[in-house]
């Protein structure tokens, strides 16, 4: 009987092991070749009507997403190419919506509501807070809201240093009843220090907010907006001064919010016709914003304006503490 030497034993063991490994690897390669390829996309939103004004698109499309990016948009993308498929048939699919008039300084402005549950969770990914904060309260707004929420929040700075922190259901006195609170110097400084998030200046001119010195306050807001070369948003309706005098101080790029409100100080004359001063303002580039709010929109005004070919430039919600849970009164 032949006894294997240690060298022969090691040689045979090595050859056998190598052969087994080669066979196993061969099977692995074969199985790997038969496996379906890994999905190209993380998520496929399938069959929805995609409305994307930036692309001039309003049609049924599939949208493939990889990571945080839109990877592909086509009329038909196979479901096998995505790890997860969301059936959007019968639904509208849009880019994140933008609302240019909200109030999200929760806990400081009585109107304020939490940004994320109201905005990004409902498909509104970018908002402009319209004057909740003034020069004295803006640092807190930036630190505790803008810098921490998932919603992308920009701001219009209130010309009043206290912002919208005074007026509430239990305290019917607005932020400009004392004209000394309108401080262009502080507004300009605050805007210059926060140019990345402040997009303009905001003023409210209702009687219980600006009193009988509304035009004086508006001129101070105009001064601040001009100094920083940013637009001015003006809350109209129920003011001491007539709308024509307010419009005379507005320029191209400025915004009238609550533009289709009913009642005193609106865009219609007593016969339901568009005021000529409104026509002139729009012609020189002043923009009309809906700013629906809790009582700042009138179907009657809107219908009369539309019949006279006057359209809003933007449709904003003016969402706040007193309309978030609805229903919202309309005239």
PLM regions and their residue ranges:
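Histidine/acidic-residue-rich, glycine-tolerant segments that coordinate divalent metal ions
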Residues: 131-138, 145-275
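N-terminal secretory signal peptides and thylakoid transit peptides that target proteins
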Residues: 1-18
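His/Asp/Glu-enriched, well-ordered alpha-helical/loop segment
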Residues: 300-331
